[in-house]
């Protein structure tokens, strides 16, 4: 009799322990189910880089004085500055400037120490190419302004992983209505069109 009761008690204990383990596993599953999706459907969705994102370097040819400070502060002496001395004005004249982004580590030293602010970091990160030599940007390619993600009506910009409310480090607990801090591209276009029509009507 006592043996049967002991077996029943052990069975109940094992069943309770199994239910506990199942509950722990399901709690993790349900926790992930209530979270918002973190998968980015690239290239139809793109993350908006943060304000201090260090992307492709933008170069302004007219501001450069060929001082070569960027070359001296670069850990790998990467920028190629081609200049000649103009005896008539007794100054250096810049002829060519290039940076190989296949080697660049995007440390930002050149931007920080440039005395004329002719270098700046952009939010452009799509530098993939089939030929590594195409990553060697000359002054013309470096002078091209980047195309912002927020200006592309065919792409949905995802802001929640770049811009979060103060004190929030986990985007999963935000309300469902705050998935995007900004507007959808189609809403932006409609708003701009409405503002343009309003300005036309006021005139």
Swiss-Prot record:
UniProt binding sites for [4Fe-4S] cluster 1: 64, 67, 70, 114
Protein name, entry field: NAD(P)H-quinone oxidoreductase subunit I
Primary location group: membrane
Protein purpose: NDH-1 shuttles electrons from an unknown electron donor, via FMN and iron-sulfur (Fe-S) centers, to quinones in the respiratory and/or the photosynthetic chain. The immediate electron acceptor for the enzyme in this species is believed to be plastoquinone. Couples the redox reaction to proton translocation, and thus conserves the redox energy in a proton gradient.
Catalysis: reaction(s): a plastoquinone + NADH + (n+1) H(+)(in) = a plastoquinol + NAD(+) + n H(+)(out); a plastoquinone + NADPH + (n+1) H(+)(in) = a plastoquinol + NADP(+) + n H(+)(out)
Occurrences of domain 4Fe-4S ferredoxin-type (ranges): 55-84, 95-124
Gene Ontology molecular function: any one: 4 iron, 4 sulfur cluster binding
Keyword rRNA processing listed: no
Gene name of the encoded protein: ndhI
NCBIfam families recorded: ndhI, NuoI, PRK05888.1-3
EC number(s) from the headed UniProt entry: 7.1.1.-
Translocase as UniProt keyword: yes
Co-factor note (free text): Binds 2 [4Fe-4S] clusters per subunit.
Subunit architecture: NDH-1 is composed of at least 11 different subunits.
Top enzyme class: translocase
Binding site for [4Fe-4S] cluster 2: 74, 104, 107, 110
GO terms classed as biological process: photosynthesis, light reaction
Family according to the record: Belongs to the complex I 23 kDa subunit family.
Keywords assigned by UniProt, alphabetized: 4Fe-4S, Iron, Iron-sulfur, Membrane, Metal-binding, NAD, NADP, Plastoquinone, Quinone, Repeat, Thylakoid, Translocase
InterPro entries, per database record: 4Fe4S_Fe-S-bd, 4Fe4S_Fe_S_CS, NADH_quinone_OxRdtase_chainI, NDHI
One term under GO cellular component: plasma membrane-derived thylakoid membrane
Cofactor section: [4Fe-4S] cluster
Annotated compartments: Cellular thylakoid membrane
Membrane topology type: Peripheral membrane protein
